[in-house]
Amino acid sequence: MSVVGIDLGFQSCYVAVARAGGIETIANEYSDRCTPACISFGPKNRSIGAAAKSQVISNAKNTVQGFKRFHGRAFSDPFVEAEKSNLAYDVVQLPTGLTGIKVTYMEEERNFTTEQVTAMLLSKLKETAESVLKKPVVDCVVSVPCFYTDAERRSVMDATQIAGLNCLRLMNETTAVALAYGIYKQDLPALEEKPRNVVFVDMGHSAYQVSVCAFNRGKLKVLATAFDTTLGGRKFDEVLVNHFCEEFGKKYKLDIKSKIRALLRLSQECEKLKKLMSANASDLPLSIECFMNDVDVSGTMNRGKFLEMCNDLLARVEPPLRSVLEQTKLKKEDIYAVEIVGGATRIPAVKEKISKFFGKELSTTLNADEAVTRGCALQCAILSPAFKVREFSITDVVPYPISLRWNSPAEEGSSDCEVFSKNHAAPFSKVLTFYRKEPFTLEAYYSSPQDLPYPDPAIAQFSVQKVTPQSDGSSSKVKVKVRVNVHGIFSVSSASLVEVHKSEENEEPMETDQNAKEEEKMQVDQEEPHVEEQQQQTPAENKAESEEMETSQAGSKDKKMDQPPQAKKAKVKTSTVDLPIENQLLWQIDREMLNLYIENEGKMIMQDKLEKERNDAKNAVEEYVYEMRDKLSGEYEKFVSEDDRNSFTLKLEDTENWLYEDGEDQPKQVYVDKLAELKNLGQPIKIRFQESEERPKLFEELGKQIQQYMKIISSFKNKEDQYDHLDAADMTKVEKSTNEAMEWMNNKLNLQNKQSLTMDPVVKSKEIEAKIKELTSICSPIISKPKPKVEPPKEEQKNAEQNGPVDGQGDNPGPQAAEQGTDAAVPSDSDKKLPEMDID
């Protein structure tokens, strides 16, 4: 079973796998561990990753990048409106109201959802992992920013399904970094001791995230998170781009922003310049040849000037740092370490700001680029039954407070209640109790819209169906289980109605006989963090079982709280009935549409595969043309007649011209047939060359064999001791076979020497190999027959043993005899060691 962690970044992606030796970040087909988050659409296929990155400028309108933040967002979203101006491709409104991406693919205009585009990237990363692991990849853990809302998280989950992946967990990027940091630490405080507080700062290409985590041995608890969703490396790039657009506009009279290709080229150069300035404080040049209207442009920049231009951005570094300390009520002295990751943290001014705020040196023990994917792979290994991993519990937080709203007839309006506060532990479940006579609807929403980086605070509506009053007309008790799962997604996971069955005896009043106003109140059962933490550590296969356990425990606790003392005296029976729940999720893709996207992705993967095979077949023809044309005037020259060489060379030239004209775009089979046609002419020449190389070596080997056997035959005839045990008839057979082989070899050599090199050889290498094998199989068993061993006679030893007792020496041995007996009874040291030596 494969264990894979995927860091799905804004600009680039990483894939890590868990193996017996630990966690390994794997490389793609370009031997690069970083895969650009880029997809280019062409007339025949899609290019994904590094291949697409090279087409950003040449195929700008159909090359998609920077789409990560479109997940779960409507086309009218202010964020989408702001992003559109920076994109080379078209962003359109889909029939559902969501943001779509418009490109030309397979010679026709196509609109793709953000989920489809992300699924394409995930399919590529999946293929990369499978090529390294040599087995299918299904289970994975995918990273998302900690500030993602429900709609965005569900959108990413849909993308994983389209790509054919089973996402065991959507993991917050800062939590993944914390796991990668903590699981290997051997010096963490014990569970009963004060935890170690570590701040993790992650500034990537598009966003800035901060979290505070408390570590104990085998335990990680996220205390709080803070973020700036738009502060990242690209903002610093934009400062440089805007500066040079203005400078080149004045200096060269160019309107750079009117030409998207020119703007993309400038963006690439500015990103390189920014990275150079991180390591160099001196003036650095920026030069671009034939930049726009055949004009070469150049400029300079240094770190000091760049930092002055970025003052507004640098001022945004501190607020999230201050926010996490305020949320956790920690002092700077309570922080053990500040660990930084993400590409933008390499900017010296950013590091200086963070270090100055905490008043301590920053820690860089983690790989700034790969920490997230390594943490995801570790989480996948923890969830997978295929790996035995050190026990390590992970408790995350809810980034925004979540509330429920419902209609309350008794109060003639709506009521609401906050079920999960900000920084509440997650994953987590709660059981709520309602008293209702009819179906009702719960509306989930984020209760602090001002803190939300998303325009719509609504999460979903959950309608609890088939609610009926009790037999006496009173309100029924309805238990609703709400939870934030391991993906950070809120849901009403179940609802049940408690039916009361009364006996015929007079009973004391039940809890259900409350006044109408009290019936409308909601009761929240006590929380169970321990159950959730246990569920967190169980393998993915046991999730359902854990949830059942959690529900039953919550139910029993609820009964204890709700059941009044009078009920013990009354003879009352209760039963629960599961109620159906209808979900209306914000921007959720329906199952039918999701299946269609899965089918379309499969078709596109197959089209890419067919196009690759077609290109490989075409390249094979081109490669053969160049190879044979070169060798015909080189090493193959002696093995082909002048007329044949001229005609074959002409054929190769015609094929080359055909490849760039009529044969430029042909089906795969046409190229396969063309290659076979060329090989019919070229293969005989190649074989003649190979035979001329191998034949002398094999004849030499055969000659050595014959000489060896002739020497042995001569030694046998001279009756040398070494061979005097061999049978004469067998040696006659050896002599006959050797003479026949010599005659065959001489005959073939003479014929071959008379044969022209431009003609097929008289004898082929395989025939010589067969003759060597035949001669060896006949002669070798005979001449290698071992000499029979001659054992010394044992009669004298037996007589010596019998004579001793007969002479009477056995009863009264003298001193000498006694000594001899002792020697015989106790063997010497050398005698003792012999068996060991023999064994060795």
From Swiss-Prot:
The modification N6-methyllysine is found at residue 773. Keywords: Acetylation, ATP-binding, Cytoplasm, Methylation, Nucleotide-binding, Phosphoprotein, Stress response. Residues 514-533, 788-799, 829-840 have a biased composition (Basic and acidic residues). The modification Phosphothreonine is found at residue 538. It comes from the Eukaryota. It is found in: Cytoplasm. GO terms for cellular component: cytosol; extracellular exosome; mitochondrion; nucleus. Residues 500-575, 783-840 are annotated as: Disordered. Its main location: cytoplasm. The modification Phosphotyrosine is found at residues 89, 336, 660. GO terms for biological process: chaperone-mediated protein complex assembly; protein insertion into mitochondrial outer membrane. CDD domains: ASKHA_NBD_HSP70_HSPA4. One of its GO terms (molecular function) is ATP-dependent protein folding chaperone. The modification Phosphoserine is found at residues 76, 393, 415, 546, 647, 756. The modification N6-acetyllysine is found at residues 53, 430, 679. Interacts with TJP1/ZO-1. Belongs to the heat shock protein 70 family. This is Heat shock 70 kDa protein 4. It comes from Pongo abelii.
